[in-house]
Amino acid sequence: MPASRPTVFREPTFARGDSPMAQYDVFPNPSHSAADGVPYVVVIQSDLLDALSTRLTMPLAKLDAAIKVPTALCPGIVVKGKRLHALAHYAAPLPAKNLRRAVDNVSAQASVLESAMDAVMSRV
């Protein structure tokens, strides 16, 4: 039986155009047709999964103040000084190559995003 070779850790490789991005980085919405109402998306995927070609994102929407939203699912998030609502129930993977340049990082607001995902998964 041949001797096994030791496992060697290798840095993740990224598809052309992909790059590592931090959890809670905020990017312009790559869907130009939806960008008026949903100007940004936030990466909620763990940095441990950077080698994947997609990123789990949560849309950040402009909502009229008169519209009542369930705050457990749609918490308010401040991005570049503007209040938006995270739409946890619309979280979806996007190709990493479509997320070009981060405009903000909302890691200081991570707990409300995590609570919103928890509400989607276990409290709705």
What are these regions (language model features)?
Residues 26, 34-76:
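Compact nucleic-acid interaction/catalytic patches
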Residues 2-20:
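Mixed-charge, Lys/Arg-rich low-complexity intrinsically disordered regions
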Residues 77-124:
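C-terminal terminal-subdomain/extension
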